[in-house]
């Protein structure tokens, strides 16, 4: 479709641009007139709560590892040398559900096929945690889910770190601190 009369379009844009501040002003009046707020804070004090939860998961994993439990692992993020001292938020924690039959781990530059679900910590409305991303689609099990092809280097540092330690067929629950996930940015799956 081609625009034949550009003058009409320019005039319309100018009118909308002039009306936009006028349309926003009444909206600001209505929102400012509220005497009480019934807004639900979905993630109250999210950063501090996330850090407390992370510290607990990290400590519990290290206790389990020290007790000889081989289903728990702690890995430093892929981009920090193992010899360097780092805060615990530079690590991911893994609970191994199933060890796969495959050998070898993907490199940072590799593509992988993955079934995954991304969930946040439990919140006001989501007692099991909000699922913000998934490769599962409408499937309910890994048997019926189609894996998603991903380039390891395109993922968050936490996700990329986990993948570089996995073998084909591994089934892990991976715990990632916000610093190695999306940080303070909003992600919409």
Q: What are the roles of these predicted feature ranges?
A:
Residues 17-24:
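Sec-dependent signal peptide hydrophobic core
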Residues 2-13, 33-189:
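Cross-family detector of peptidyl-prolyl cis-trans isomerase
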